[in-house]
A protein has these predicted regions:
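Conserved eukaryotic protein kinase-like
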Residues: 1-206
Length: 206
């Protein structure tokens, strides 16, 4: 079990990292038990690279856990996507980018741990008439601004610049205040400053 080295103003996050440093294997077991060994009852979503679960940590903090899909022989189906997400999220930090807490790279249970977004994905909200009504034009404008700020940070403030390559309503998550957070960095690319860069489309179409 590994963690992202970062400073957080929230004491509970610091406590989480302290537990991770002290006994990562024990914390890994707690996460697996917390989601009932990746039971479908704890599932809150699924994507091309993994299945998302919700669980509560020993300190009482609720987190989201993305378990990577496995191939028929039990190995991780897309190791490249797994490494890409870890590499990207350990190099960036922004209020409009999902916060990354850590990961497990055991063969049978490879997963990533993130902050939990109470409102879920923008796509799910827009697909629900009742929830969509809560998104007035000011809220929607703030969502767009949040995504734009995250992309501007990745493109202009990171060195080398980072290209997400799969911005969609499914990868924009909203917290309890409807603040936008960009997620899913499995297809990102770091641009080389000393050469021409050509980046193909990846991920969601539409």
């Amino acid at each position: 079990m590994s963690k992202r080295k970062t400073k957080s103003p929230e004491a509970d996050v610091e406590d989480l990292f302290a537990i991770w440093d002290h006994d990562g294997e024990l914390l890994c077991e707690h996460i697996i038990q917390g989601i009932d060994n990746f039971s479908s009852k704890q599932c809150i979503g699924t994507g091309g690279f993994g299945t998302l679960y919700k669980t509560e940590m020993p300190i009482g903090r609720v987190v989201a856990v993305k378990k990577l899909h496995s191939s028929e022989d039990g190995d991780m189906a897309d190791l490249k996507a797994f490494k890409s997400e870890i590499h990207t999220l350990t190099h960036i930090r922004h209020r409009n980018i999902i916060e990354f807490y850590g990961f497990s790279s055991f063969v049978e249970n490879s997963f990533l741990v993130y902050e939990f977004m109470e409102k879920g994905s923008l796509r799910n909200i827009l697909s629900n008439d009742e929830e969509a009504e809560k998104l007035d034009w000011m809220v929607r404008l703030n969502v767009v601004k949040g995504v734009a700020k995250a992309l501007s940070y990745m493109h202009h403030d990171c060195s080398p610049p980072i290209i997400h390559r799969d911005i969609s309503s499914n990868n924009v998550l909203l917290d309890s205040e409807y603040e936008a957070h960009v997620s899913d960095f499995s297809t990102t690319r770091f641009l080389k400053s000393d050469s021409s860069n050509w980046t193909s489309m990846a991920g969601t179409f539409g």
